């Protein structure tokens, strides 16, 4: 479902990980749907390349989205974003 960029992916993910979703919304309640989806893919341990393939955008676009997420979620540059997301 995630690898096919299925529109139901978001609702299915929220059903499976409701606590994660609530914590994410607590940290930054104004995330866009695209930003939320990138967080969901990161939670599932998708690589930047895999996220790009699933969302039909370039690797560079995903790198930029991850950098913007760092700013929006107040993640320091020396912190691994995968670990931060996983510990949320």
Region spans (language model):
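Cytosolic nucleotide-binding catalytic cores of signal-transduction proteins
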Residues: 3, 7-88
């Amino acid at each position: 479902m995630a690898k096919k960029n299925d529109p139901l992916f978001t609702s299915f993910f929220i059903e499976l990980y409701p606590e994660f979703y609530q914590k994410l919304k607590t940290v930054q309640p104004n995330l866009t749907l695209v930003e939320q989806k990138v967080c969901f893919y990161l939670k599932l341990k998708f690589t930047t390349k895999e996220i790009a393939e699933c969302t039909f955008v370039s690797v560079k676009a995903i790198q930029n989205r991850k950098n913007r997420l760092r700013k929006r979620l107040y993640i320091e540059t020396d912190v691994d974003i995968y670990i931060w997301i996983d510990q949320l």
